[in-house]
Design a protein with these regions (language model features):
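Solvent-exposed loop/turn segments connecting transmembrane beta-strands
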Residues: 46, 113-120
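Solvent-exposed coil/turn segments that connect beta secondary-structure elements
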Residues: 40-43, 75-76, 111-114, 125-134, ...
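N-terminal secretory signal peptides that target proteins for export/translocation
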Residues: 1-4
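Acidic/histidine-rich, surface-exposed loop or edge segments in extracytoplasmic proteins
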Residues: 32-44, 74-79, 182-187
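Bacterial N-terminal signal peptides
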Residues: 7-18
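N-terminal segment of the mature soluble domain
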Residues: 45-110, 154, 204-215
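Envelope-exposed proteins and targeting segments
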Residues: 31-34, 66, 102-107, 120-125
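C-terminal/domain-edge helix-coil "capping" segments
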Residues: 20-31, 117-121, 132-220
Length: 220
Protein backbone atom coordinates (compact mmCIF):
# COMPACT_ATOMS: atom_id res chain seq x y z
CA UNK A 1 0.00 0.00 0.00
CA UNK A 2 2.84 2.33 0.91
CA UNK A 3 4.53 1.55 -2.42
CA UNK A 4 1.36 2.46 -4.34
CA UNK A 5 1.11 5.78 -2.47
CA UNK A 6 4.71 6.60 -3.29
CA UNK A 7 4.18 5.77 -6.96
CA UNK A 8 1.03 7.94 -7.04
CA UNK A 9 2.91 10.80 -5.40
CA UNK A 10 5.70 10.54 -7.96
CA UNK A 11 3.17 10.43 -10.81
CA UNK A 12 1.38 13.52 -9.46
CA UNK A 13 4.69 15.36 -9.19
CA UNK A 14 5.58 14.50 -12.79
CA UNK A 15 2.16 15.59 -14.06
CA UNK A 16 2.40 18.83 -12.09
CA UNK A 17 5.85 19.51 -13.54
CA UNK A 18 4.64 18.81 -17.06
CA UNK A 19 1.61 21.03 -16.52
CA UNK A 20 3.76 23.90 -15.29
CA UNK A 21 6.14 23.41 -18.20
CA UNK A 22 3.28 23.47 -20.72
CA UNK A 23 1.77 26.55 -19.09
CA UNK A 24 5.14 28.33 -19.18
CA UNK A 25 5.71 27.45 -22.83
CA UNK A 26 2.21 28.73 -23.72
CA UNK A 27 2.88 31.97 -21.85
CA UNK A 28 6.23 32.40 -23.61
CA UNK A 29 4.68 31.74 -27.02
CA UNK A 30 2.01 34.39 -26.36
CA UNK A 31 4.53 37.06 -25.43
CA UNK A 32 5.28 39.71 -28.07
CA UNK A 33 8.72 39.75 -29.62
CA UNK A 34 11.03 42.05 -27.64
CA UNK A 35 13.39 44.34 -29.56
CA UNK A 36 15.75 46.82 -27.89
CA UNK A 37 17.19 49.68 -29.94
CA UNK A 38 20.77 50.73 -29.28
CA UNK A 39 21.66 54.44 -29.64
CA UNK A 40 21.84 55.28 -33.35
CA UNK A 41 25.46 55.53 -34.51
CA UNK A 42 26.50 58.54 -36.57
CA UNK A 43 28.97 57.41 -39.23
CA UNK A 44 27.98 60.09 -41.73
CA UNK A 45 30.56 62.69 -40.73
CA UNK A 46 27.83 65.30 -40.15
CA UNK A 47 28.59 66.96 -36.81
CA UNK A 48 25.08 68.31 -36.28
CA UNK A 49 23.42 64.89 -36.32
CA UNK A 50 21.08 64.43 -33.32
CA UNK A 51 21.60 60.84 -32.26
CA UNK A 52 19.09 60.81 -29.39
CA UNK A 53 16.36 62.21 -31.59
CA UNK A 54 17.13 59.67 -34.30
CA UNK A 55 17.04 56.83 -31.75
CA UNK A 56 13.67 58.02 -30.45
CA UNK A 57 12.31 57.95 -34.01
CA UNK A 58 13.37 54.31 -34.46
CA UNK A 59 11.91 53.28 -31.08
CA UNK A 60 8.66 55.12 -31.78
CA UNK A 61 8.24 53.41 -35.15
CA UNK A 62 8.89 49.92 -33.78
CA UNK A 63 6.52 50.45 -30.84
CA UNK A 64 3.69 51.73 -33.02
CA UNK A 65 0.83 49.25 -33.16
CA UNK A 66 1.76 47.42 -29.97
CA UNK A 67 2.73 44.13 -31.65
CA UNK A 68 6.31 44.37 -30.34
CA UNK A 69 7.77 44.96 -26.88
CA UNK A 70 10.22 47.86 -27.28
CA UNK A 71 11.96 49.22 -24.15
CA UNK A 72 12.26 53.04 -24.01
CA UNK A 73 15.52 54.48 -25.31
CA UNK A 74 16.53 55.85 -21.90
CA UNK A 75 16.17 52.39 -20.37
CA UNK A 76 18.50 50.95 -23.02
CA UNK A 77 21.03 53.71 -22.40
CA UNK A 78 20.85 53.06 -18.64
CA UNK A 79 21.46 49.33 -19.17
CA UNK A 80 24.48 50.09 -21.37
CA UNK A 81 25.83 52.49 -18.75
CA UNK A 82 25.48 49.81 -16.08
CA UNK A 83 27.53 47.53 -18.35
CA UNK A 84 30.17 50.23 -18.83
CA UNK A 85 29.45 50.47 -22.57
CA UNK A 86 28.25 53.08 -25.04
CA UNK A 87 26.82 50.23 -27.14
CA UNK A 88 27.02 46.44 -27.29
CA UNK A 89 29.27 45.09 -30.04
CA UNK A 90 30.39 41.54 -29.33
CA UNK A 91 28.02 38.54 -29.15
CA UNK A 92 28.62 38.30 -25.39
CA UNK A 93 27.79 41.99 -24.89
CA UNK A 94 24.67 41.74 -27.05
CA UNK A 95 23.57 38.69 -25.06
CA UNK A 96 24.09 40.47 -21.73
CA UNK A 97 22.18 43.52 -22.93
CA UNK A 98 19.28 41.38 -24.12
CA UNK A 99 19.21 39.65 -20.73
CA UNK A 100 19.22 42.98 -18.87
CA UNK A 101 16.31 44.30 -20.93
CA UNK A 102 14.31 41.08 -21.19
CA UNK A 103 14.25 40.99 -24.99
CA UNK A 104 15.07 38.50 -27.73
CA UNK A 105 16.53 40.97 -30.25
CA UNK A 106 18.93 43.92 -30.30
CA UNK A 107 18.71 46.42 -33.15
CA UNK A 108 21.70 48.56 -34.12
CA UNK A 109 21.15 51.37 -36.64
CA UNK A 110 23.86 53.53 -38.22
CA UNK A 111 23.66 56.62 -40.41
CA UNK A 112 26.15 56.20 -43.24
CA UNK A 113 25.37 59.48 -45.01
CA UNK A 114 23.39 62.56 -44.05
CA UNK A 115 22.61 65.82 -45.85
CA UNK A 116 20.05 67.93 -43.94
CA UNK A 117 19.46 70.36 -46.81
CA UNK A 118 17.01 69.72 -49.68
CA UNK A 119 17.21 67.53 -51.62
CA UNK A 120 17.80 65.40 -48.52
CA UNK A 121 20.10 62.40 -48.31
CA UNK A 122 19.88 59.80 -45.54
CA UNK A 123 21.93 56.61 -45.60
CA UNK A 124 20.91 53.98 -43.06
CA UNK A 125 22.18 50.54 -42.16
CA UNK A 126 20.49 48.24 -39.66
CA UNK A 127 21.51 44.96 -38.04
CA UNK A 128 18.95 42.99 -36.03
CA UNK A 129 20.58 40.41 -33.77
CA UNK A 130 18.26 37.67 -32.51
CA UNK A 131 19.18 35.19 -29.81
CA UNK A 132 18.62 31.51 -30.54
CA UNK A 133 18.18 28.67 -28.01
CA UNK A 134 19.02 30.72 -24.94
CA UNK A 135 17.50 27.99 -22.79
CA UNK A 136 16.08 25.04 -24.69
CA UNK A 137 14.27 23.53 -21.67
CA UNK A 138 13.79 25.87 -18.68
CA UNK A 139 12.51 23.01 -16.51
CA UNK A 140 15.04 20.35 -17.46
CA UNK A 141 14.99 18.09 -14.35
CA UNK A 142 18.71 17.39 -14.67
CA UNK A 143 19.55 21.11 -14.66
CA UNK A 144 16.94 21.88 -12.00
CA UNK A 145 18.43 19.29 -9.66
CA UNK A 146 22.03 20.24 -10.39
CA UNK A 147 24.24 22.21 -8.06
CA UNK A 148 24.64 25.95 -8.75
CA UNK A 149 26.75 26.85 -11.77
CA UNK A 150 28.62 30.08 -12.36
CA UNK A 151 26.55 32.01 -14.98
CA UNK A 152 29.78 33.35 -16.43
CA UNK A 153 30.76 29.83 -17.39
CA UNK A 154 27.65 29.37 -19.52
CA UNK A 155 28.18 29.80 -23.29
CA UNK A 156 26.49 32.83 -24.85
CA UNK A 157 23.39 32.17 -26.90
CA UNK A 158 23.88 31.84 -30.65
CA UNK A 159 23.02 35.06 -32.47
CA UNK A 160 21.38 35.28 -35.86
CA UNK A 161 21.85 38.56 -37.74
CA UNK A 162 19.41 40.19 -40.17
CA UNK A 163 20.81 43.11 -42.18
CA UNK A 164 19.42 45.86 -44.38
CA UNK A 165 20.77 49.13 -45.71
CA UNK A 166 20.06 51.82 -48.25
CA UNK A 167 20.87 55.41 -49.19
CA UNK A 168 17.66 57.44 -49.47
CA UNK A 169 18.52 60.24 -51.91
CA UNK A 170 15.64 62.63 -52.61
CA UNK A 171 17.22 63.53 -55.97
CA UNK A 172 16.33 60.03 -57.15
CA UNK A 173 12.92 60.16 -58.82
CA UNK A 174 11.78 56.77 -57.49
CA UNK A 175 12.82 57.65 -53.94
CA UNK A 176 11.04 61.02 -54.11
CA UNK A 177 7.89 59.35 -55.43
CA UNK A 178 8.03 56.71 -52.71
CA UNK A 179 8.44 59.39 -50.03
CA UNK A 180 5.31 61.15 -51.30
CA UNK A 181 3.39 57.87 -51.23
CA UNK A 182 4.57 57.24 -47.66
CA UNK A 183 3.47 60.74 -46.60
CA UNK A 184 -0.17 60.20 -47.60
CA UNK A 185 -0.75 57.95 -44.59
CA UNK A 186 1.40 59.82 -42.05
CA UNK A 187 -0.41 62.49 -40.05
CA UNK A 188 1.98 65.30 -39.13
CA UNK A 189 4.66 64.12 -41.53
CA UNK A 190 3.13 65.02 -44.87
CA UNK A 191 6.08 66.95 -46.30
CA UNK A 192 9.08 64.59 -46.32
CA UNK A 193 10.70 66.38 -49.26
CA UNK A 194 10.61 69.71 -47.40
CA UNK A 195 11.11 68.70 -43.75
CA UNK A 196 14.16 66.72 -42.65
CA UNK A 197 12.39 65.21 -39.63
CA UNK A 198 9.69 63.74 -41.87
CA UNK A 199 12.22 62.53 -44.42
CA UNK A 200 14.30 60.80 -41.74
CA UNK A 201 11.18 59.05 -40.43
CA UNK A 202 10.37 57.94 -43.96
CA UNK A 203 13.86 56.45 -44.30
CA UNK A 204 13.55 54.71 -40.91
CA UNK A 205 10.19 53.24 -41.94
CA UNK A 206 11.60 51.76 -45.13
CA UNK A 207 14.72 50.42 -43.39
CA UNK A 208 12.67 48.68 -40.69
CA UNK A 209 10.28 47.26 -43.27
CA UNK A 210 13.26 45.72 -45.09
CA UNK A 211 14.65 44.28 -41.85
CA UNK A 212 11.31 42.80 -40.78
CA UNK A 213 10.79 41.33 -44.23
CA UNK A 214 14.02 39.38 -43.75
CA UNK A 215 12.69 38.13 -40.39
CA UNK A 216 9.20 36.76 -41.17
CA UNK A 217 8.07 36.13 -37.57
CA UNK A 218 8.84 39.65 -36.33
CA UNK A 219 5.83 41.67 -37.42
CA UNK A 220 5.63 45.44 -37.06
Amino acid sequence: MTTVRIQMAVLCSVLTLLGCHQSMMQTQSNQPLGIAVQPVRNESGWGGFEGDRATDAVVERLARGGSLFVPPADRVRAALTDMGLDRARTPAELDRLADALGVQCILTVSTTSFDPYPPFVVGLEGVLHERRNKQANPLDPVRTDASPVDPGAQPAAALQAFRAGRVFDAQDADTASDAKTWARSRVGHDAPLREMDSYFRYAVDRLLEALMASKPNAGM
